[in-house]
């Protein structure tokens, strides 16, 4: 993915969670090393697999090992964080919570939602294109029960009040496109396929999206694995 993205002169690699499987320390060590070798700046947020056990959440392994890839402004706590670059505000939100086996739910939480609203308001006043990074799907009906965002409605209420230019999520391992209501116009929501996922289903092949942020719009080109290479 990185080699292909660099061919298009990508400015930054953005990953919306699940960088590990079981949130084990050796996994995080490997991920950290690979991201440092990427050859371009990286921004990440955690997924449910990155807090797979209560111990990993308690020890804050994701933040300890990958904190350098979440550099940005914070009002308090780890999330949300704001990374500003070339007229864009990347706003990293965490939905990662430990859960029971075979359960993959997420939650933003009221304190983080309040800080997210303030971050969206502040970056809008700066005239930045606001791109939210979040792991769990934020569109109703996309995630099945026991795999969904528990406070999806509350998240949607924040977006309805403050808006955003784009919301990126992961979790579902497939391409998803939709919108959430915003204060002035619908807010695009894009699910990003897993870059390493192998499946017989065409819509679940390994994939990534390349975004261009222009003065009037954000455009997306979808790149997917055809069995031997990534193609647009």
Predicted feature locations:
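Extended active-site neighborhood of metal-dependent phosphoesterases/phosphodiesterases
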Residues: 29-115, 157-160, 183-185, 209-210
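Short acidic, glycine-rich surface-loop motifs adjacent to enzyme active sites
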Residues: 10, 123-141
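N-terminal active-site segment of His-dependent metallophosphoesterases
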Residues: 1-30, 36-37
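Active-site environment of divalent metal-dependent phosphoester hydrolases
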Residues: 21-24, 48-57, 98-102, 137-141, ...
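Active-site neighborhood of phospho(di)ester-bond hydrolases with catalytic His/Asp-centered motifs
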Residues: 12-18, 42-48, 94, 131-134, ...
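Conserved beta-sheet core of the metallophosphoesterase superfamily
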Residues: 144-215
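A short C-terminal boundary segment appended to hydrolase-like catalytic domains
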Residues: 213-232
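Residues at alpha-helix caps and immediate loop-helix transition turns in enzyme cores, especially N-
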Residues: 26-28, 57, 104-105, 112, ...
